[in-house]
């Protein structure tokens, strides 16, 4: 899970094939009206979520959408809701899952360029919180691993580099450049 400030990007393996999904971050406080009963669907077409007693809904057009382009988003309710929303959009049946999420380099590393264990643990604790989905089963985050943004993109390339080669990764995100 690349839980960036403007989109959540998912990648998973299903039936031997890598699947991907991009889900925009646009959530407003409070729930939106559902259209249950107006379609043949057995579950509501809404995207209403609750976390720690706070209600949010996915709404790409709302002027009241919560701002996600700040560092505090990484540890916020909306970050967790956005991850769950992306999982719900993936088509994967709700179940316990293990995920890998990211932090911007400035949050992942401390002033000595070492992993900032306090921020990493804060991120893990945030993502493990329970999110309920109105009228539907929800995912349970069983295990969370945290990596610095941009670095996971190079894993496949790094294994094929020799000792004299190097790799530069430029991650142009919605609000950061790593």
Can you describe what each PLM-predicted range is?
Residues 1-169:
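Nucleotide/phosphate-binding catalytic cleft detector across ATP-hydrolyzing
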Residues 166-178:
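Basic (Lys/Arg-enriched) interaction patch that binds polyanionic ligands
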